[in-house]
Amino acid sequence: MNKIKEMLLKIGDFGKNPDGSYTRGCYSKEYFQAFNAVQEVMKQLGMETSSDAAGNIHGFYKGKNPSKKSIIIGSHLDTVPHGGLFDGAYGVAGALEVLRRLKDNQIELEHPLEIYGFNAEESNPIGGTFGSRAITGLVDVKQPGFKEAIEKYGHTPEEILACQRELKNVKCYLELHIEQGDRLYNEHLDVGVVSGIVGIVRFKVTAIGASNHAGTTMMKNRKDAMVAMAKLIAEGDKICREIDDTLVFTVGTIQCYPGKSRMYF
């Protein structure tokens, strides 16, 4: 664990904020500093390294039998704004430690071992899980706004399409990840095996009200959009709690227009 912690802190040097949190946005200077640190360790471990236009760092280590399919281990190196040390980076550090332990114990796998540090897993202008979607051919480069968004990062849709790799030579993909909920923690368990992951559906909801004087319009005549939105949020939360623990509901952003006049009490 000491080597994993050492690698985590090395990655964490890049994008560390004064409050102790971490910010490594996709394609950012801090992201590529972490990228370079991981690439350096890959080379020290004897891996052949490569990168792609999607911003992924990739390491390849030969097994006993080159004809065997690859075992891939990895995670992402970017973070949410003011994120934690472990999210994503823990999986990359853990993958590197797997190879280190194999070499230290002179264990040679039958299969090749590949390690990925993915870019742009978190929400961003080009879409979340971007790096892994790029290598699996799941990026829709024709979606509105994608061309302009990726060009801001110095790349073209064609370059992203070229990131796709052959998947028939992959045996499996493994990822070590921190628990982002509280189930294992509450049950005092150290580790769990994931059998399914969250499927995210996002909606933009508009509540249309009627603008009027904030101080003199009587309550019976008000049609405040924020009141309607508050009721929608409360009802959505209530419905999800009545179903089961496999469904969650979150509202992350509210924008009120014109929102020019406020009354304070």
What feature does the model see in each segment?
Residues 1-28:
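N-terminal capping segment at the start of a domain
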Residues 4-7, 66-73, 200-205:
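Short coil-to-beta-strand
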Residues 18-28, 45, 211-217:
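Glycine-rich, flexible beta-strand/loop modules in the N-terminal catalytic cores of phosphate-handling
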Residues 39-43, 48, 58-151, 168:
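Active-site metal-coordination/substrate-binding segment of hydrolases
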Residues 120-129, 133-265:
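Midchain, well-structured core segments that form catalytic/ion-binding scaffolds
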